[in-house]
Amino acid sequence: MLDPKLLRDDPAKLIERLNTRGGDFTEVIEQLVALDSQRRASQTAFNRAQAEGNQIGKQVGERLRRGTAVGDPEVLALKQRGIDLKATLALLQDQERELAERFAALLPTLPNVPRPEVPIGKDENDNREMRFWGTPPIFDFEPAAHWDLGERLGLMNFARATLVAQARFVTLMGDGALLERALIAFMLDRHRAHGYIEILPPYLVNTASMTGTGQLPKFAEDSFRCRDDDLWLIPTAEVPVTNLYRDEILTDMQLPIHHCAFTPCFRREAGSYGRDTRGLIRLHQFHKVELVKFCRPEHSPTEHEKLVADAEDVLQQLELPYRVIELCTGDLGFGAARCFDLEVWLPSQNRYREISSCSNFEDFQARRANLRFKAPDKKGTEFVHTLNGSGLAVGRTFAAILENYQNRDGTVRVPEALKPYVRRDVLSR
């Protein structure tokens, strides 16, 4: 959620920055400015009426103490004015409450403001390539898609998952389940070695948690909801881990906080009809290891760089070719002020595909979740900055290993980093 001060100080500049995301936010911002102005005017009028009422009470008391009769015309006039002011106060209070509620409902619909260094662009075609790592493998045969490799080797079965649930689910079997479990353990071990504290959070969260991290109200259609209990299946571990500190004031000594968490993730993929209908790239249920950070505002750019490096480390250890891109304003996520995507090479598609998205939200989520800290050198409290990123999406890493490590005979070599977990060199039928 944006700082209301941005609306008051320079609404024209705010409109200009948000409009670089695509669309036109002019009308919404003008509505918010008007509501905020009306609410503050109502508050001022309330304060004045309240002060006048208090003064009238004192005047009546003074007259009565001096022996003025209760029925004196001046006393009666003052009392009537007091009665009128009470009615006015009630009216102004209701008016202010309504304006505040309308403002509070509209403000969360605005996305975060892109940082100044974010490249301006319309869509993914305008994203900026930052760097490449590794060399895509060259095969002397036509590389198979990961879903074909996986089913031939008995690692995965989509038909049985569809029988149990519906399309866009998978059942991992035998060495497929082993490889998935190995990847999860490997990723968590790497991040723990880098100082992250592991969390195993709830997989169901309440509406306040979904709102706190920005999934609601915008992404309600893409989420699975248990309506009878007002709970939501988590779309990412970012939601429960960030909300562990909701409505809390942290001490400066507690920061920075670095967490890693493995969870299943659940997404309806409402807007993805016809895209990635086969394989592990886009499922309703998938596994992910998430990295979540909380820090002081001045430290978030550096923490962002470290976050990206920690996600890259997993790909480098697995020796998977990838590239890093910076998202332009038009491709930036709703709550992100800046974002870097890691894209892994998939030989069957002859292109890089997203495997991690590392975002700096600055104070956007913290304002929604009321997550603050007390700095010893400043009065009052400040909102922390939050950051998160995949470290990594497990299913997509699984797919990348199958495709990049495949052999002509249909077997798949196990990356050196995973051999202590899988305890074999090759995956075969």
UniProtKB/Swiss-Prot annotation:
NCBIfam families given in the database record: serS (TIGR00414)
Presence of keyword Nucleotide-binding: yes
Domain of life: Bacteria
Membership in a protein family: Belongs to the class-II aminoacyl-tRNA synthetase family. Type-1 seryl-tRNA synthetase subfamily.
Single GO MF annotation: ATP binding
InterPro entries for this protein: aa-tRNA-synt_IIb (IPR002314), aa-tRNA-synth_II (IPR006195), aa-tRNA-synth_II/BPL/LPL (IPR045864), Ser-tRNA-ligase_type_1 (IPR002317), Ser-tRNA-synth_1_N (IPR015866), SerRS_1_N_sf (IPR042103), SerRS_core (IPR033729), tRNA-bd_arm (IPR010978)
The protein's Enzyme Commission number: 6.1.1.11
GO cellular component: cytoplasm
Job of this protein: Catalyzes the attachment of serine to tRNA(Ser). Is also able to aminoacylate tRNA(Sec) with serine, to form the misacylated tRNA L-seryl-tRNA(Sec), which will be further converted into selenocysteinyl-tRNA(Sec).
Catalysis: reaction(s): tRNA(Ser) + L-serine + ATP = L-seryl-tRNA(Ser) + AMP + diphosphate + H(+); tRNA(Sec) + L-serine + ATP = L-seryl-tRNA(Sec) + AMP + diphosphate + H(+)
Name assigned to this protein: Serine--tRNA ligase
Predominant location category: cytoplasm
Pathway terms, separated by semicolons: Aminoacyl-tRNA biosynthesis; selenocysteinyl-tRNA(Sec) biosynthesis; L-seryl-tRNA(Sec) from L-serine and tRNA(Sec): step 1/1
Gene Ontology biological process terms from the UniProt entry: selenocysteine biosynthetic process; seryl-tRNA aminoacylation
Record text on subunit structure and interactions: Homodimer. The tRNA molecule binds across the dimer.
Residues involved in ATP binding: R267, R268, E269, E354, I355, S356, S357
Annotated localization: Cytoplasm
Domain notes per entry: Consists of two distinct domains, a catalytic core and a N-terminal extension that is involved in tRNA binding.
Keyword set, alphabetical order: Aminoacyl-tRNA synthetase, ATP-binding, Cytoplasm, Ligase, Nucleotide-binding, Protein biosynthesis
